[in-house]
């Protein structure tokens, strides 16, 4: 392997180049990053940074790049791939040659096809965070479209700023597909107990605009006045570069268990990659922090000739009011949930079990340093009587 180019200066790209150098690769390495920042972690954007805490989200020490002779090109976008000549065209006009190209272009907020939606707030970047934080003035009214993880995290942060928050969710319960009815009901109750006006079974039809921007939303249940509107209805993978270069795209860039596209010189990792998981025997596109880190490191290992494959279970975490949790696994839609511990006190473990009694996923809420034990349980058969909150 000669020169490596990584397109995308997010967490996955940062961890890939960190690993390449950490494992002794000495060839030229360049990261092309569209944002005007060094790679940073996004989870604090909807948590500590939105609460006004002084948290540094930077993924690598600023001195690291020079110390490790990795070229970081910020505020530069890759606009075209010439796979035949193995080069990337940048919006600065240059062409960069690669021997191995890693696409780590991440995802972008989904913008609904509704009047006015392009004028709403979204949350993906540091600049977005600044805009959302500026909107969190005590007494202001914030309408949040979508009760997914980001929408609910922003709702929690906004209530801490004493903002009047209305959350509008199309489904009957927030995050029911992930948590199941009982636990999503628990989360909904928690938000309501903190003054969030969480409305479910409601569809948003328009973001209403005044002369200075959004002034509310029109919904299937009437109009809601607001000073700010945030749309948080998920993300779409940034696949344009790959698609235009003729690579297979199907809900992300399609890659095998070693993150390779059909072109042996091009890999894809992180939020943009729809990668075959050998353990779960299915293709997965995972939009989580842990996945970006693991795939970044793993693709470096693959490029260095190691026998590394995508075989780990998805993991993620959230913090909303008193509900702080880690979640591991991939339960099926019909798996049943068993809880152990104090659900009302937000200190419990939830286990997902399939029809055969095998653990398919688990979540530790307010109980820490147990997620590795839960991960080890996934895929094993456990008698319900043997499931505990792991605290004794
Ligand atoms: P990204 O972080 O999206 O980075 C991709 C980068 O590539 C971007 O900077 C983009 O500008 C750049 N790029 C795209 N196209 C080009 C191009 N053509 N040329 C150059 N650069 C390009 N996960 C959790 O597990 N727990 C959490 O609590 C959590 N909280 C989150 C909160 C927020 C607000 C957000 C937005 C995400 C959160 N996530 C969380 C998800 C997690 O942050 C992502 O999974 C992770 O950032 C993915 O990293 P990535 O490097 O694959 O992509």
Q: Model regions: which residues?
A:
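FAD-site-proximal beta/loop scaffold in flavoenzymes
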Residues: 118-139, 209, 213-293, 298
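Mid-to-C-terminal Rossmann-like scaffold of FAD/NAD(P)H-dependent oxidoreductases
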Residues: 2-3, 272-368
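Rossmann-like dinucleotide-binding cores of NAD(P)H-dependent redox enzymes
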Residues: 141, 150-206, 312-317
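FAD-binding core/adjacent interface of flavoenzyme oxidoreductases
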Residues: 1-5, 58-143, 219-220, 230-232, ...
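Beta1-alpha1 glycine-rich phosphate/pyrophosphate-binding loop at the start
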Residues: 2-71, 157-179
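A short, polar/charged loop-to-alpha-helix boundary motif
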Residues: 368-384
């Amino acid at each position: 392997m000669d020169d490596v180019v990584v397109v995308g200066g997010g967490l996955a790209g940062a961890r890939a180049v960190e690993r390449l150098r950490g494992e002794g690769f000495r060839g030229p390495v360049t990261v092309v990053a569209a944002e005007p920042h060094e790679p940073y972690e996004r989870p604090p954007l909807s948590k500590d940074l939105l609460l006004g805490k002084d948290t540094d989200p930077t993924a690598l020490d600023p001195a690291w790049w020079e110390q490790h002779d990795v070229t970081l090109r910020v505020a530069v976008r890759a606009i075209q791939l010439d796979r035949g000549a193995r080069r990337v065209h940048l919006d600065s006009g240059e062409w960069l040659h690669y021997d191995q190209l890693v696409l780590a272009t991440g995802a972008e907020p989904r913008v609904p096809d509704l009047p006015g939606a392009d004028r709403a707030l979204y949350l993906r970047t540091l600049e977005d965070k600044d805009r959302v934080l500026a909107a969190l003035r005590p007494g202001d009214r914030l309408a949040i479209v979508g009760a997914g993880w980001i929408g609910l995290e922003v709702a929690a942060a906004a209530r801490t700023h004493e903002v009047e928050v209305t959350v509008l969710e199309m489904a009957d319960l927030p995050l029911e597909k992930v948590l199941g009815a009982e636990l999503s009901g628990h989360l909904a109750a928690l938000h309501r107990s903190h003054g969030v006006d969480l409305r479910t079974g409601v569809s948003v039809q328009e973001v209403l605009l005044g002369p200075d921007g959004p002034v509310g939303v029109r919904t299937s249940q009437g109009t809601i006045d607001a000073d700010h509107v945030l749309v948080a209805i998920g993300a779409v993978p940034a696949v344009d570069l790959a698609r235009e270069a003729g690579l297979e795209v199907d809900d992300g860039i399609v890659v095998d268990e070693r993150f390779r596209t059909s072109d042996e010189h091009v890999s894809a990792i992180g939020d943009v990659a729809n990668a075959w998981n050998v353990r779960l025997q299915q293709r997965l596109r995972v939009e989580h922090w842990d996945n970006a880190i693991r795939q970044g490191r793993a693709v470096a290992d693959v490029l260095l000739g190691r026998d590394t494959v995508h075989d780990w279970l998805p993991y993620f975490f959230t913090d909303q009011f008193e509900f702080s949790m880690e979640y591991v696994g991939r339960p099926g839609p019909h798996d049943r949930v068993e809880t152990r511990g104090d659900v009302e006190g937000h200190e419990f473990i939830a286990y997902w079990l399939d029809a055969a009694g095998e653990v398919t996923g688990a979540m530790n809420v307010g109980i820490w340093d147990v997620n590795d034990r839960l991960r080890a349980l996934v895929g094993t058969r456990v008698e319900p009587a043997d499931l505990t909150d792991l605290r004794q």
